[in-house]
Amino acid sequence: DALVNKGRGRNIGIDITLERFLEKGLYYMISGSLFDSRYRGGDGVWYNTKFNRNYVINGLIGKEWMLGRNKQNILSINLKLTLQGGDRYSPIDMEATMKHPDKEVQYDERKAFSKQYSPMLIGNYTVSYRINKKKVSHEFAVKGLNFMGTKEHYGHEYNVKTGKIDATD
């Protein structure tokens, strides 16, 4: 049988941004997106896409201080927070999973991406020091990525010890 693509995709949304450019060493930006991302399969039914989180809100704030004999070096601190809807996933077909010889997780694609994990709050920070000279500059930085330890989900797997299906982080 030849493959036929009778599907269709649709993405709609709105973005808004509020930004303050560097003034007296302070800057910030707040942005938000509300969106809906769906596709229509060959069966004519509209489904969520895997990436349909529905919303993302970002906040960034930072401060810079000019240091050094001629105020040519920069000490910088910034913080970024992101709140976003959870990842989408398809429900697990337990019966098909248990029948699979390797217990590989099988998903119910008739309900594709109808489930959604909890919203995620992710935080990052940076502290840096930049040394500026006539023909060269150096920057030293410490970054904390996902410093709150938010888990992101990558799928599911069968746990042989417990006989249950676990989310993979």
Could you describe each region identified by the protein language model?
Residues 1-3, 40-45, 105-113, 160-165:
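Extracytoplasmic loops and strand-loop junctions of Gram-negative outer membrane beta-barrel proteins
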Residues 2-86:
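Gram-negative outer-membrane beta-barrel transporters
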Residues 4, 33-38, 98-105, 153-154:
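Short amphipathic alpha-helical segments, especially helix-boundary/capping motifs
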Residues 5-7, 50, 112-116, 168:
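Alpha-helix initiation/capping motif
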Residues 57, 104-105, 116:
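Extracellular beta-rich repeat passengers
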Residues 81-103, 120-122, 129-169:
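C-terminal beta-signal and adjacent terminal beta-strands/loops
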Residues 110-117, 127-130:
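Short, glycine/charged-rich beta-strand-loop motifs at protein surfaces that mediate ligand recognition
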